[in-house]
């Protein structure tokens, strides 16, 4: 099992070595900006490296939105992110599910997701990540994910399970992996994060493993059950220990 972390994009290879990571995740630009990622001077070196690199798409992306001023730029920046990810030989691009304005728009939100994926041209796989909060989110509640997957599941999209988001959404971690696999047939990546807040809070505040509200045994069990590469999106201080903890507990 590959275990690693979300690191600074400045020098992912050096960061991986410093943290003892088998795999890393990076942003290719400002995650709060609509600006396209800039070409990287080290693109060839990253592409040639044996280290798997995942790319997290900008947080602003909302493919489900009815607002053209959000949805159209979302499609554009996802396309640009996928192209930039291909330039560095990335393993996949991870994108959040987004949301709609009210319950009456949820089914249309699913269809907007479908249109976005049908129009997307990418050499790199795209993974949908479950999210922590939002009353009208596409990927917070597992029952909503199931409805979304009925619409987009045959596009080849993958799935990234975030443990903190699952906890914050009020979904039980004890059988989360089994339930998601029953919906999607796959888990391609795990974001293994503790949570600073109580279950069902809707708050996306990560904590280092063992320092938050989630029983570390639950995190280990989820990672083992998923059987996918793992990224710790935790604070710099303590993240190396998070990797070592998971490696020891999973025998990886």
From Swiss-Prot:
Its EC number is 3.1.21.2. Zn(2+) 3 binds at residues 165, 204, 206. One of its GO terms (molecular function) is zinc ion binding. SUPFAM superfamilies: Xylose isomerase-like. It catalyses: Endonucleolytic cleavage to 5'-phosphooligonucleotide end-products. Gene3D superfamilies: Divalent-metal-dependent TIM barrel enzymes. Disulfide bonds: none annotated. One of its GO terms (biological process) is base-excision repair. Keywords: DNA damage, DNA repair, Endonuclease, Hydrolase, Metal-binding, Nuclease, Zinc. Its cofactor is Zn(2+). Induction: Repressed by transcription regulator Mce2R. It comes from the Bacteria. Belongs to the AP endonuclease 2 family. Endonuclease IV plays a role in DNA repair. It cleaves phosphodiester bonds at apurinic or apyrimidinic (AP) sites, generating a 3'-hydroxyl group and a 5'-terminal sugar phosphate. This is Probable endonuclease 4. It comes from Mycobacterium tuberculosis (strain ATCC 25618 / H37Rv).
């Amino acid at each position: 099992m590959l275990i690693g972390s979300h690191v600074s994009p400045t020098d992912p290879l050096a960061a991986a070595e410093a943290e003892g990571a088998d795999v890393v995740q990076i942003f290719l630009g400002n995650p709060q900006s609509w600006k396209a990622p800039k070409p990287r001077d080290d693109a060839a070196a990253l592409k040639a490296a044996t280290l798997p690199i995942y790319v997290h798409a900008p947080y602003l992306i909302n493919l489900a939105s009815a607002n053209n001023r959000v949805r159209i730029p979302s499609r554009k920046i996802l396309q640009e992110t996928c192209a930039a990810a291909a330039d560095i030989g990335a393993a996949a691009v991870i994108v959040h599910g987004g949301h709609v304005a009210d319950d009456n728009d949820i089914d249309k939100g699913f269809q907007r997701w479908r249109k976005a994926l049908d129009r997307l041209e990418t050499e790199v796989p795209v993974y949908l990540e479950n999210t922590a909060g939002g009353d009208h989110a596409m990927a917070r509640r597992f029952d909503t994910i199931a409805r979304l997957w009925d619409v987009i599941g045959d596009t080849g999209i993958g799935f990234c399970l975030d443990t903190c988001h699952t906890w914050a959404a009020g979904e039980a971690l004890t059988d989360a992996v089994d339930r998601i696999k029953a919906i999607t047939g796959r888990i391609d990546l795990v974001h293994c994060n503790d949570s600073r807040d109580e279950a069902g809070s809707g708050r996306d505040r990560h904590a280092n493993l063992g320092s938050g509200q989630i029983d570390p045994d639950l995190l280990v069990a989820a990672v083992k059950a998923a059987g996918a590469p793992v990224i710790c999106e935790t604070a710099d201080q303590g993240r190396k220990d998070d990797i070592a903890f998971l490696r020891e507990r999973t025998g990886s």
